[in-house]
Amino acid sequence: MSSTIPLAWYLMLSAFLFICGVIGFMIKRNIITIFMCIELMLNAVNLTFVAYATELRSLSGHIFVFFVMVVAAAESAVGLGIIIAVFRSRETLNVDRVNLLKL
């Protein structure tokens, strides 16, 4: 990326962020926390795309990150709408207590 920070450091940071997101997704039971962990994983992938695109002096990685961010924004809007609907009907955000097959 730059002359002072090698590509490997960016990739290690991206891997660390992705692993934190996966661990949070697996351990946490709150729907909003799980949603934030998914967004953290998306941002880790975006960091990897930007790091490789800058290292290879390519614009395609930056453009792909832009599209991923647009899709993530749409996903956030739809996901939060679903979370609000689930909370209104079940009055909880705990994944273990939310069973949409029961009335």
From Swiss-Prot:
It is found in: Cell inner membrane. The keyword Amino-acid biosynthesis does not apply. It catalyses: a quinone + NADH + 5 H(+)(in) = a quinol + NAD(+) + 4 H(+)(out). The keyword Translocase applies. The chain crosses the membrane at residues 7-27, 31-51, 63-83. One of its GO terms (molecular function) is NADH:ubiquinone reductase (non-electrogenic) activity. GO terms for cellular component: NADH dehydrogenase complex; plasma membrane. Disulfide bonds: none annotated. It comes from the Bacteria. It is a multi-pass membrane protein. Its EC number is 7.1.1.-. Keywords: Cell inner membrane, Cell membrane, Membrane, NAD, Quinone, Translocase, Transmembrane, Transmembrane helix, Transport, Ubiquinone. One of its GO terms (biological process) is ATP synthesis coupled electron transport. Pfam families: Oxidored_q2 (PF00420). NDH-1 shuttles electrons from NADH, via FMN and iron-sulfur (Fe-S) centers, to quinones in the respiratory chain. The immediate electron acceptor for the enzyme in this species is believed to be ubiquinone. Couples the redox reaction to proton translocation (for every two electrons transferred, four hydrogen ions are translocated across the cytoplasmic membrane), and thus conserves the redox energy in a proton gradient. Belongs to the complex I subunit 4L family. NDH-1 is composed of 14 different subunits. Subunits NuoA, H, J, K, L, M, N constitute the membrane sector of the complex. This is NADH-quinone oxidoreductase subunit K 2. It comes from Koribacter versatilis (strain Ellin345).
